[in-house]
Amino acid sequence: MTVSNLPDALLLVAFGGPEGPVDVEPFLQNVTAGRDVPADRLAEVAQRYLSRGGKSPGNDRMRALLAAVQTELRSRDLVVPVVWGNRNWHPFIEETVEELERQGHQRVMAWFSSPYRSYSTCRQYLEQISAATEGCSVSVERLRPYFDHPGCIEPAADRLREALLTLPADLRDETCLLFSAHSLPLASADTCAYVDEINEAARLIAERVSPQGQHRWEVVWQSRSGSPHVPWLVPDVGDRIDELAGLGVQAVAVSPVGFPVGNFEVEWDLDVEAAQRAAAHGMSFARADTIDQDPRFAAMIVDLLVEHCTSGATPAALGNLGVAPAACPSHCCPPPP
């Protein structure tokens, strides 16, 4: 099989984050536009960012990933420019599309930093891309979701193994593995594949880290926002740590399975809040690193591009849910009610 019909460019699509203190408030206004987020909650989140210099680690992570993807493409003698666009901060998707048009690129493939399907991790990005390309010469197709791709699962398993090694030796075999992902309103979670895909990815990672089943493992949720009156996915990671301490669990290792690319929510909600909850119980705590800096992750992005452009290619997938389509069905991931 030969690679043919390569696109004019590859667009890496991400959430975005502030680059400094002056960016925090407008960034959060973008994130919460049209949502019922209490003002005190917004102020609380803003203070968290400001306490760490007002900068999200996500942008630097995406810059490094873009460079790694460029290197991987060159190693395969594939000539495809790589660009980057965010949903919520510069470079915005709209800005990147404008630049692509100025450069004469027409056919563009997009890779999403979240491998899971929900309105906020999938369709909302597609809607923004559609609006950005309306009336211009740039056409954007997305690469397929990759939640169970070996380039996603194997690095995550390695990062979790490394995290376990930082715990006291006498507690490692009894450590509870927690797989954390961004919570969603139940009304949204019930209309998409998000929860099933998170659970499948967690299972695949757990089976590699604990092949004999010696470790208990669970999926937990983090970073909920919005109205406190709206039910969201539970258990919250901090609440579950409290419950596990009451059950006598002495150590937890958290894999940020929902966040392949490092961001502020991982560093705050897990490294600060979840770690503090564990420390309050005298519980040993470790957090696995995200996988965006693993060379296999950048290689996976190029693999997905090559797969899309190669007639008869067999998709690489480890799970039991089937390969998700690149083009979402019209009924997939509807907007929240």
Q: Predicted segments — roles?
A:
Residues 2-337:
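Active-site-proximal alpha-helix that buttresses catalytic centers in soluble enzyme cores
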